[in-house]
Structure formats: structure tokens, C-alpha cells
Amino acid sequence: MTQVHAADHTTHPSNFRAAAAEVVTDEWWFGFEQEFFFTDPKTGEPLGWEDGTPREQGEYYCGVGASNVVGREISDAHLEACLELGITLTGTNAEVALGQWEYQCFGKGIKAADDLWVSRYMLFKIAEEFGVGVNIHPKPKTGDWNGSGMHTNFSNEEMRSKGSKELFESMCEKLGKVHEDGIASYGSDNDMRLTGLHETQKITEFSYGVSDRGASIRIPVYTVEHDWNGYLEDRRPASNADPVSYTHLRAHETLP
């Protein structure tokens, strides 16, 4: 990754990373869940949709078998390439819609955002070698199909080792107060995805809850079971969100 500078070596106005790097220290841990669709480069349709709309969702998520999964060899090649580069991908899985996939990318500090950007680049490059496209739009297919998000798990030192129910709930309340500002930075066309359906909260509303996949912020069972030491999951960011902007916002908005 490189930063953009002007001819006089000052930070270019488009360089959001410089400001983020000053506040997003290694105390902050991020786990990005990057969702996307593999696509036919000629038609733009998701892989597996060549003969029309496939059967409804239900058997594709973490599925096995040629009738349930397409693109696994590409996902596996991407995983191996990222690991060789030192990018910590912690897992992959077929997602809810046919042709939709996810990988999880973990990192500390601003490197988390850098690694997600590089992993996206590698995803497009490796898919190209297979003659396949990639779509990270948050709602490539309308109708009764899940969109694609960038659910983000995050924590700082206090959350991991000095947590309490009061701390986590106060963080959620604070995030609720700046919900509109956050949404503006969570990717384009996110209103098509955050409808209140398909495991989302409405874009105009904010909520949080324990193990609630329909909430804006999910408090994981892991956190509760570890005496309120752990992390939060922000389910609002779209699959095309900028991880640099996200980490910068999080370091500002979540602090007491």
C-alpha cells in the first residue's frame, strides 16, 4: 500500500489514510467480513445464474456440492495467495446466495485497513486468472436475495480486558447518536441493502442487541460469556465501504 502525496510532498486531500494512521493504533483490532459475488464477465450475472434465476436461498450458505456452490477453487486460491503475502485471512465461506462468497480479514491498527484493500486487489486479480469477474456492490440482485456487506468486528484494549455491560452498552448508545454520520461513510448504495430484511436493520434506524443479526450493532455471545470482555460487530458497512475511513471513524466514535 502507498499513500498519495502532492508534488510538494504534503498529504494530498484525497489521502484519508494519513489522518487515520495517527489515531488508529495497534490497540484497535478489526475483523472485516468481506462479502462479494463472483460473476460472469460477459453478462455480469453471478456465477451459477447462467440458466436464469436459481432456486431460492437456503442451501447455499456454507454449502457443499456442485448444485449448491460455485467458485470455491477461486476462493481457495485467493486465500492461499493472501496468506503467502502475510495478510491474515482467518476463514472463507460460501454465502447465502448462489455465487456469493465471504472471507474474513483480521488486522491490528491501520494495517487492518491496508490488508483489506490489498486482499480486494488480489481477489480481482486472481478471479481474472480464472476468467471470472467480482462484484462488491451491496445489492447486486434485487428481490429475495441477501445483499453483500462488510460486517466489521472491532475492539480496543479496554473492551478486551476491562469490559463491562455498562461499557459495551454505552459504546452502542454513542454509536447510535452518530448513526447518520456513520452511514454516510459506510459505502455507496447501502440503502438498497439495509432494508430491515435479509439480516439487516433499516438504514434509517439504529438498534443493538445480544446475538441479534437484525440489529445495527450485534453484541456477540462470546463477549457476554467472557464477562463482557470482547468485541462488537458493526453490521452496517456495505461491501464496498472504505476500511480506512471505517477504522478512522471507529477510533473517534467509540472512545468514551
Residue ranges and their predicted role:
Residues 1-94, 132:
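ATP/Mg2+-dependent ligation/transfer catalytic cores
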Residues 236, 241-242:
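Long, repeat-rich segments with strong aromatic
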Residues 93-104:
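Active-site-proximal, well-structured secondary-structure segments within enzyme catalytic domains
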Residues 10-12, 114, 160-164, 242-243:
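Short, conserved charged micro-motifs
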Residues 102-113, 128-235:
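Loop-rich catalytic cores of soluble enzymes, especially ATP-dependent carboxylate-amine ligases
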Residues 247-254:
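Conserved small/polar residues in nucleotide/adenosyl-binding loops
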Residues 74-85, 122-130, 170-178:
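Generic non-transmembrane alpha-helical segments
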